[in-house]
């Protein structure tokens, strides 16, 4: 649906030159919710604004639904933009117009007949849950309701793509969840491709199918959201994930002095699990089968798209050979094992 190749955006020149994007390449599939996360100034908003040419890239190509966006003339670009809706952190509603009239506005610009446009607006207000607010003015709405109006307005021309630039960052957590739920519902009902810019990993976890992590103007990781959460591949990804799920083992546990257990060995391990294995008594089965002790020191669990994932830090106590056999058993059960430290006789 969207193919971005070697995209670079430079502002200014000479000593004032700033590289906002550096050789960015992405492939966004039709019908998915694709998240782009990064810190302030990383380049994520510049990237999304290049997709509909609100920002012209310095070099590189952007293909949207088979069209090279950068090669379009003014008329062609205007037509393409009608098929790319956009919502923002600030709602940009017209204060002198009612909710109905705000949603009607892009249809007026497109010269859609009034009766047809009115039917369209009513359907959109029903979709976003604002039928009873049609004749209300923006100042009478909550932040979440204003964003719902913005979403309805962005959908007025039946876009194929919806761009969301920090659309929930000004909202409280409960309202954010409500708006994300609406976007997922729209994605499911309309088959709409959604590109979602955020600095909040909770937004990625709750709404997205795949995610790209941008750091210092460059894409550093792209992947399925579940895989990124369960096995982040870069320090930037780990930092974002740790902001909502602490995957890092506390130092006092990691550097724990292994206790002398006489003739037995002691080994500190981290066990990572994902999907069905999270609900199975694998650790209990290991303890019973190999007659070793397992001391649970630390752990956490969470869900992405109703799939559980997490990790446990365990101290295993027993004969060296038996512990090795137990670790092989865990691996055969599909668990990822990391040995943190060990001691033994």
Curated annotation (Swiss-Prot):
Its main location: membrane. Its EC number is 7.4.2.11. GO terms for cellular component: plasma membrane. The keyword Cell membrane applies. It is an enzyme of class 7 (translocase). Residues 2-241 form the ABC transporter domain. InterPro entries: AAA+_ATPase (IPR003593), ABC_transporter-like_ATP-bd (IPR003439), ABC_transporter-like_CS (IPR017871), ACT-like_dom_sf (IPR045865), MetN_ABC (IPR041701), MetN_ABC_transporter-like (IPR050086), NIL_domain (IPR018449), P-loop_NTPase (IPR027417). One of its GO terms (molecular function) is ATP hydrolysis activity. It is a peripheral membrane protein. It catalyses: L-methionine(out) + ATP + H2O = L-methionine(in) + ADP + phosphate + H(+); D-methionine(out) + ATP + H2O = D-methionine(in) + ADP + phosphate + H(+). Coiled coil: none annotated. Keywords: Amino-acid transport, ATP-binding, Cell membrane, Membrane, Nucleotide-binding, Translocase, Transport. ATP binds at residues 38-45. It is found in: Cell membrane. The complex is composed of two ATP-binding proteins (MetN), two transmembrane proteins (MetI) and a solute-binding protein (MetQ). Belongs to the ABC transporter superfamily. Methionine importer (TC 3.A.1.24) family. Part of the ABC transporter complex MetNIQ involved in methionine import. Responsible for energy coupling to the transport system. This is Methionine import ATP-binding protein MetN.
